[in-house]
Each structure stands twice: as structure tokens, then as C-alpha cells.
């Protein structure tokens, strides 16, 4: 299995509920790198990169997010891998 990299956008009740924090924790558990940033329109943009199995598990988790969030829509597409290591939030 190779590496995969996706940029993901999630909408719903995803800001002010710990979404980025829990996303970072889950990504690090899965050995992924990337970021989770709040956007001005109330959505969250996430870049995830790493082993295919971990990325696929993360995509499944992001469909629902943490218990504190309510994801109403999710879109993703392949993207270049991040320039930096680790997993960052704004």
C-alpha cells in the first residue's frame, strides 16, 4: 500500500466544538500528517496524508467527526502532500 493525500472540507456544526482538536488527535493516532483549519464560512478544511489504510480510516471518521460535532456535508479530493511534517491546526 502506498501513500494517499486528500484535502477534505466538512460543513455543519464543526467550529467551536473541538473538531480540529479531535481531528488532530485521531490523525496522529493513525500516523497521518497534514492540518485542520477553520475557514471563514464556518467549515473546516483538513489535509490528510499517509498510508492508504490510515487515510481511508480517517475519511470514514471525518464523515461523522467527534460526538460534539454534527457533520452535514463532506467533500474530498486528491491533493499534493503537505510541505511540513506533523499535524497542525489554526
Swiss-Prot record:
Entry's EC annotation: 3.6.1.7
Record bears the keyword Lipid metabolism: no
Acylphosphatase-like domain mapped to chain residues: 5-90
InterPro entries tied to this protein: Acylphosphatase, Acylphosphatase-like_dom, Acylphosphatase-like_dom_sf, Acylphosphatase_CS
Catalysed reaction, written as an equation: an acyl phosphate + H2O = a carboxylate + phosphate + H(+)
Molecular functions per Gene Ontology: acylphosphatase activity
Keywords, sorted A to Z: Hydrolase
Pfam families reported in the protein's UniProt record: Acylphosphatase
Catalytic residues, chain numbering: 20, 38
PROSITE patterns per record: ACYLPHOSPHATASE_1, ACYLPHOSPHATASE_3
Family: Belongs to the acylphosphatase family.
Protein name in UniProt: Acylphosphatase
Gene: acyP
